[in-house]
């Protein structure tokens, strides 16, 4: 009975409090409007429930239910902007920002009210715009660095030639000439080597060239330098006869000699101190490489022993670390004719073939799966495309880029990329099947989404 009286008294108290709430809400609608009355009602209800929780214990389940209901009710309540002061009523009122919790659906709105955007929409760049941005950020080299690299390479060439003249006074060398992509405007970033040619001066009439396919190596990339006129000029008449192997000038013997000289004989610390840089011969590579470190840049100088202009075609042959039966042969260097042909094609129609080559080189260097594609492969692709009479203006650079990817994929499917100047040479012959598959997959993915390569 006492418990019933307690509940009844509580109910009466609730009825009195409820009447007071109703009275406040009824008058609040007139003063504050519907929205203000709703806020006042929720606040009053929260105070009432707080008093109820303090005066009577409640079940845990009921407490949890009321809690998430109140939370959802508060989330669903629109946040009203404060009313402007009376003095500002004549001023234009800014539109209210839409609430993120407002229910979705069609709603009538004033056509003069424009939504306020918090941040601008992201720009959608075209492939052409992305290529130009990639070229600016990843391909172009500052002119100051180019000038410094040329100066260092020229100084190293002079110092090295002076040393060779003192070390081998009996061997006639030509002028040590630095060159390569850096000097031809074909340098893609700082990864390309500076080519330092060390030409051999051979006596006219004592030497002739034999195609590599006519030797035991059967290699169309190479040539053999044969000693002739032995009956009139016996062996020993030429200072280069000391490098003969089986009647042929051996590139391997010359490479071994120069490797020992560059690694152990040249005083690189003294030369580096004189030039203001650090010079170290690379011992890890089979090529003759010099690593140059300057406070403003780093570059690699490739020392290339060359045999120039032995025949009427003025071929340039390099002593290259070849394997097997071709170890004593000389590799034909196609870089000079490739660079000259690209320059001639671009000059003919003010084209962008060389820019396309630089973009492809930078893209392949930036993707590990495409690292096997070197400058030689990409140059052949651009040359094949460049001979076509199509649009080579800057506006068509994106289209030519995709066309180059398609040509590479087609060549990989056939595992064949013929040399532009010697179709019997397949530039993909040294790639394994697994490498071809990896490169092809990366290129196919890049063709579907070219932006992923940039």
From Swiss-Prot:
Residues 1-22 are mitochondrial intermembrane. The lineage of its organism: Eukaryota, Metazoa, Chordata, Craniata, Vertebrata. It comes from Pongo abelii. This is Mitochondrial dynamics protein MID49. Residues 44-454 are cytoplasmic. The keyword Repressor does not apply. It is a single-pass membrane protein. One of its GO terms (cellular component) is mitochondrial outer membrane. Does not bind ADP or other nucleotides, in contrast to MIEF1. Interacts with DNM1L. It is found in: Mitochondrion outer membrane. The gene is MIEF2.
């Amino acid at each position: 009975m006492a418990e019933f009286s307690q509940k009844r008294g509580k109910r009466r108290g609730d009825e009195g409090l409820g009447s007071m709430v109703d009275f406040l809400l009824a008058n609040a609608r007139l003063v504050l409007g519907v929205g203000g009355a709703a806020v006042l009602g929720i606040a009053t209800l929260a105070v009432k429930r707080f008093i109820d929780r303090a005066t009577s214990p409640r079940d845990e389940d009921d407490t949890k239910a009321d809690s998430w209901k109140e939370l959802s009710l508060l989330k669903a309540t629109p946040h009203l902007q404060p009313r402007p002061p009376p003095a500002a009523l004549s001023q234009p009122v800014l539109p209210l920002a839409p609430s993120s919790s407002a229910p979705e659906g069609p709603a009538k709105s004033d056509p003069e009210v424009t939504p306020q955007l918090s941040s601008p929409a992201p720009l959608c760049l075209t492939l052409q715009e992305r290529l130009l941005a990639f070229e600016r950020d990843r391909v172009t080299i500052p002119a100051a660095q180019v000038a410094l690299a040329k100066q260092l390479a020229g100084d190293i060439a002079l110092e090295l030639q002076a040393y060779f003249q003192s070390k081998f006074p009996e061997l006639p060398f030509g002028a040590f000439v630095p060159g390569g992509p850096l000097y031809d405007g074909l340098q893609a970033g700082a990864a390309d080597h500076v080519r330092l040619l060390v030409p051999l001066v051979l006596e006219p009439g004592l030497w002739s060239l034999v195609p590599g396919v006519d030797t035991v190596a059967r290699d169309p990339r190479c040539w053999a330098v044969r000693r002739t006129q032995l009956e009139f000029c016996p062996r020993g008449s030429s200072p280069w006869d000391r490098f003969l192997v089986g009647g042929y000038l051996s590139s391997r013997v010359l490479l071994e000699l120069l490797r020992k000289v560059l690694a152990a004989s040249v005083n690189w610390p003294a030369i580096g101190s004189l030039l203001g840089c650090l010079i170290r011969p690379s011992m890890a590579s089979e090529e003759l490489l010099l690593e140059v470190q300057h406070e403003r840049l780093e570059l690699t100088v490739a020392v290339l022993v060359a045999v120039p202009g032995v025949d009427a075609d003025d071929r340039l042959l390099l002593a290259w670390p070849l394997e097997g039966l071709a170890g004593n042969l000389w590799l034909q260097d196609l870089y000079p004719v490739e660079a000259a042909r690209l320059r001639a094609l671009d000059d003919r129609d003010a084209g962008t073939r060389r820019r396309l080559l630089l973009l492809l080189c930078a893209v392949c260097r930036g993707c590990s799966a495409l690292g096997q594609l070197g400058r030689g492969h990409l140059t052949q692709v651009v040359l094949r495309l460049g001979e076509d009479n199509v649009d080579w203006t800057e506006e068509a650079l994106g289209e030519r880029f995709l066309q180059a990817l398609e040509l590479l994929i087609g060549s990989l499917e056939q595992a064949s990329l013929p040399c532009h100047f010697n179709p019997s040479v397949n530039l993909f012959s040294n790639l394994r099947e697994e490498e071809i598959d990896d490169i092809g997959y990366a290129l196919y993915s890049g063709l579907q989404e070219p932006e992923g390569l940039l």
